[in-house]
Amino acid sequence: MAEEIFNTAVITFTLVLVGLGAGYLLLRLTPDD
């Protein structure tokens, strides 16, 4: 039970990190002028 919760937390955390990284890269790659 606890292991399942831990795995879910790790997957969620990884998805959040990937999402933030992708959003940051998109913002950096988009020309601001």
Curated annotation (Swiss-Prot):
Does the record's keyword annotation contain Transmembrane helix? yes
The protein's UniProt keywords, in alphabetical order, are: Electron transport, Membrane, Photosynthesis, Thylakoid, Transmembrane, Transmembrane helix, Transport
What GO annotations for molecular function exist for this entry? electron transfer activity
Entry annotated with the keyword Transferase:
no
Q: Could you tell me the superkingdom of the organism this chain comes from?
A: Bacteria
Would you tell me the Gene Ontology cellular component terms? cytochrome b6f complex; plasma membrane-derived thylakoid membrane
The regions listed as transmembrane in this protein's record are 5-25
As for membrane topology, the entry says:
Single-pass membrane protein
* Locations listed in the record: Cellular thylakoid membrane
**Its Gene Ontology biological processes?**
photosynthesis
Pfam families, alphabetically? PetM
So what family is this one in?
Answer: Belongs to the PetM family.
Instruction: Note the subunit structure.
Output: The 4 large subunits of the cytochrome b6-f complex are cytochrome b6, subunit IV (17 kDa polypeptide, PetD), cytochrome f and the Rieske protein, while the 4 small subunits are PetG, PetL, PetM and PetN. The complex functions as a dimer.
Q: State the protein's purpose.
A: Component of the cytochrome b6-f complex, which mediates electron transfer between photosystem II (PSII) and photosystem I (PSI), cyclic electron flow around PSI, and state transitions.
Protein name per UniProt: Cytochrome b6-f complex subunit 7
Native source species: Thermosynechococcus vestitus (strain NIES-2133 / IAM M-273 / BP-1)
Phylogenetic placement of the source organism: Bacteria, Bacillati, Cyanobacteriota, Cyanophyceae, Acaryochloridales
